């Protein structure tokens, strides 16, 4: 972070300039450009799409057909208006392919239970953090109107590239 008085480069977040002692607390610590978009943007800015919702009692073959039909890499498992789990293509491959017949598999056995859910007014940085730390490629989003959206890693990349 550059001091506005003497121009010395200081460490990000420094309270006092190393060169002249200027009070740096009044200098904006927000990065410019890409970093600023990540810190200041909200998930609503990413325009999450509607989630594809199934129930925990739905059959695995019917869920696979729905995912293919909708060209979606994941579905949310919702019962009683509450997100109970998320099922991704990766879950299907690791849980079914070569292990058990899809007709014999149960959705609750394959899904990730109680996924992290964010809100539309959360910062974009929350989505990056949760996806990075959790190794997720999809995050459910609770909308202000009570609906449920879905955010993907592709949505984050699209946001950053605009």
PLM-predicted stretches and their roles:
Residues 1-162:
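Tandem CBS (Cystathionine beta-synthase) repeat/Bateman regulatory domains
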């Amino acid at each position: 972070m550059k001091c506005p008085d003497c121009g010395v480069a200081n460490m990000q977040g420094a309270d006092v300039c190393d060169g002249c002692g200027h009070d740096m607390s009044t200098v904006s610590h927000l990065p410019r450009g890409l970093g600023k978009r990540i810190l200041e943007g909200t998930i609503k800015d990413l325009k999450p799409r509607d989630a594809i919702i199934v129930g925990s009692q739905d059959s695995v073959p019917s869920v696979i057909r729905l995912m293919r039909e909708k060209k979606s890499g994941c579905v949310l498992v919702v019962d009683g208006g509450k997100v109970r789990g998320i099922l991704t293509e990766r879950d299907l491959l690791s849980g079914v392919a070569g292990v058990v017949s899809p007709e014999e598999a149960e959705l609750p056995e394959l899904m990730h239970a109680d996924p992290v859910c964010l809100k539309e007014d959360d910062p974009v940085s929350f989505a990056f953090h949760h996806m990075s730390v959790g190794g997720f490629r999809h995050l459910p989003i609770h909308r202000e109107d009570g609906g449920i959206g879905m955010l993907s890693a592709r949505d984050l990349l699209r946001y950053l590239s605009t």
